[in-house]
A protein has these predicted regions:
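Short glycine/serine/threonine-rich phosphate/pyrophosphate-binding segments
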Residues: 28-30, 96-101, 125-126, 145-154, ...
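Glycine-rich phosphate-binding loop
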Residues: 130-168
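Long amphipathic alpha-helical segments
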Residues: 1-65
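Glycine-rich oxoanion-binding loops at beta->alpha junctions
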Residues: 70-74, 113-134, 179-180, 196
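Glycine-rich phosphate/diphosphate-binding loop of Rossmann-like nucleotide-binding domains
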Residues: 84-126
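Short glycine-rich or small-residue beta-strand-to-loop segments that form or flank ligand, phosphate
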Residues: 19-20, 46, 86-92, 141-143, ...
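C-terminal binding/interaction regions
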Residues: 91, 95, 133-136, 140, ...
Length: 219
């Protein structure tokens, strides 16, 4: 392919194969890259930020599962979880679910058990407390929120595991497209919180998987 160079050894180096970032690529380019990865014996191919049009085009040639909400495509089967523990993906609101599903599906593609806790934001603390057992038993937590982004700080003050904070662009004017949530998360008083870019569910899911596999893979 003249337009792309596959990193066929990434799985060997990092334990996780290359991902296709669909935004900015034509449907033809996405298909050719995915086909090349399948030919290189990749059992599962993850495609992020994929349009529905591209999904229909690729799906006509490959075994593709497409998630409309997160605009994520998966060629092949999601593997059996082999991570050490569970990854919890929590959102402040229902509006954060597109980013959350990108994170959750990414983690699942890389062999992790994922627990989804959606719409458990700080406006109703009881909703979060109803899931305290899930939070305290997690190996790593992905906390996703827009508005003021307080969810990550609250979870970070409760959990004894790493928390990956994901600011989203959900919110009104002074949210500044997710900047307010990003700054809140970066300035959190709670320890053990790391922050990825605005709406970067993929980055959070990928990092969560790396943490969940630090002690090797579960047999």
């Amino acid at each position: 392919m003249g337009f792309a160079k596959l990193d066929t050894h990434r799985g060997i180096r990092q334990g996780m194969a290359e991902v296709i970032y669909g935004a900015g690529k034509t449907k033809e380019q996405i298909l050719k890259i995915a086909q090349a990865m399948v030919e290189e014996r990749e059992k599962t191919v993850l495609i992020t930020r994929m349009s529905k049009e591209a999904a229909e085009y690729v799906g006509a040639s490959l075994d593709l599962h497409y998630d409309d909400l997160s605009r994520t495509g998966i060629v092949g089967q999601i593997p059996k979880p082999d991570g050490v523990g569970k990854i919890v993906v929590a959102t402040g609101g229902t509006s954060d679910m597109p980013v959350a599903e990108e994170a959750a599906l990414t983690a699942q593609v890389y062999g992790n058990e994922v627990v989804r806790l959606y719409d458990v934001g700080v406006a109703g603390m009881h909703r979060l407390m109803d899931h305290i057992e899930d939070i305290m038993s997690a190996r790593v937590i992905v906390a996703i929120a827009g508005m003021e982004g307080a969810l990550a700080s609250v979870i970070g003050g409760m959990a004894d595991c790493p928390v990956i904070a994901v600011p989203t662009s959900v919110g009104y004017g002074a949210n500044f497209g997710g900047l307010s949530a990003l700054l809140s998360m970066l300035n959190s008083c709670a320890s053990g919180i790391s922050v990825v870019n605005i709406d970067n569910g993929f980055g959070a899911g990928y990092l969560a998987s790396m943490i969940n596999h630090l002690e090797g893979r579960k047999e």
